[in-house]
């Protein structure tokens, strides 16, 4: 039976091997938090988390309560940290599902009932100016230290960790070092006074590679585990996702004929075109129209005409093909497939956004 539906191939072995490569860079006592928010950057949070569990990962980062519940309902073990903000009315549910929350504002604790036992990581804002207790200058440290002391005395709060997040670890070394030094000042004071705040963590994928001094007790790994290295550091990782459409139709176009909405492409000679069942509703941006190569049977093929909601068109004039062959949108560069960073560059965006844009109509298929 021929299945022509587009899909994203999720290579679990690549994911596990990527994590093992990252582990090899860390001291033995440094843990990894697998970042699986936003459906594991579009890869499928449940399958990715199960794979991480299989190789001993015990910490997971999600953005919302619902994402955490999904993992628990699929038997994911270990700590699940909600990196975003939950609603006060969700506190009881978070406790019921054994989820740890991020604390960025003391006023949130007004909604914690005396009989509750809430697990938290304290987030410190050292320069990103988003969530977290403000500590972007040395003269803020006393206030944050005293806040932590008070939290330690709060009977229904269990501090499981303390962390910060770098604003530009992949590109701004000086600012990252500034953030690291601020956070380290606080951590040193906590340690000198023998205050247990659980796991200390600061590094994302980029800073894990570029700033080993900031590994602390744990590193938070997202993009790198999915096979994308946006730094200059050398590490062997492979893409986990390949996005594939299907050649659903072919036709001959005469010189002078136009293709697609807006007539943005006019054939200069007779060409053979292929219709592929992916469009901007599936996350293949219109901005790639007439501006990118995809891969058909190991050969680069140009996207021509404007990408529409449900289909796109490629020039297959000089290709060997048959109907219902797969067309790779992005995947493994070693297989001559377009890498996702090239797609992101053409869109003037980041790989994260490209991953997260791949829609629900593109079914995820796990391979090993």
Set out the residue ranges of the language-model regions:
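Short secondary-structure boundary/capping segments within folded domains
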Residues: 24-26, 41, 265
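Active-site-proximal beta-alpha core segment in soluble small-molecule metabolic enzymes
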Residues: 2, 6-9, 16, 30-201
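Glycine-rich phosphate/diphosphate-binding loops that line cofactor/substrate pockets in enzymes
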Residues: 19-30
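A broad structural signal for alpha-helix termini and local helix breaks/kinks
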Residues: 26, 75-76, 358
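Active-site anion/phosphate-binding pocket segments in diverse small-molecule metabolic enzymes
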Residues: 2-11, 16, 67, 86-88, ...
